[in-house]
Amino acid sequence: MLLLDLMSSPSPQLLVAAAQQTLGMGKRRSPPQAICLHLAGEVLAVARGLKPAVLYDCNCAGASELQSYLEELKGLGFLTFGLHILEIGENSLIVSPEHVCQHLEQVLLGTIAFVDVSSCQRHPSVCSLDQLQDLKALVAEIITHLQGLQRDLSLAVSYSRLHSSDWNLCTVFGILLGYPVPYTFHLNQGDDNCLALTPLRVFTARISWLLGQPPILLYSFSVPESLFPGLRDILNTWEKDLRTRFRTQNDFADLSISSEIVTLPAVAL
């Protein structure tokens, strides 16, 4: 099993220190060691094109702290090219502008489907991006925004902000995180959805990284089991593409993709 060569890469101790010194300052509690190492693995996965973005939700550290964190990683020789901090609302995502633009351009070509889980429906239903014209325009807007940034990647870690007062952040984040079947719903009906007590097929993708450490959770998303047969082709294409991209890198090993069916009394999106 080929795992990270610790002789040519930063030690786990240095990766933990980089996170705790930059993301745990002031009143913020420093992330635990396991969280620090997992975050570093996710960031490396973004840099290597295995996922378009990572949503930072470890504590209340903001964009400036994340910039400092990524600068620390780069100073350790951990990142080979600049990443970008994209702030949407009160949320910060770490993205590779090149990779996320490629992903969003594929989204505009109809490579993913959406599941409408609006509370006004008795059951979830599949819809395409062409049925969600406002969302389609939003994806195009994000592409234009990120393409403008790519002209100035001389900065080690760049930062920008998108205004999102009327966005469905659940759907936008699902797209940016690379889910093949994001959930969507009508914002004027609140955050309720029709997924309660609905059997869901939960997909997880994991990769091995540091020897002796748990695998990195690369993806975790679900689709209603009743819609799975009609979504199988899209999910198979997503898996094939991920495996292809995985074979182009040598930082991670043992890509594992699995699924299980769960039923929950309520589902928060």
Curated annotation (Swiss-Prot):
Identify the domain of life: Eukaryota
Lineage, opening ranks:
Eukaryota, Metazoa, Chordata, Craniata, Vertebrata
Name one matching Pfam family: DUF4504
PANTHER family (UniProt xref): UPF0739 PROTEIN C1ORF74
What is this protein identified as? UPF0739 protein C1orf74
Q: Which family does it belong to?
A: Belongs to the UPF0739 family.
* Regions annotated as coiled coil: none
Q: Which organism is it from?
A: Homo sapiens (Human)
Looking up InterPro entries in the UniProt record yields: DUF4504
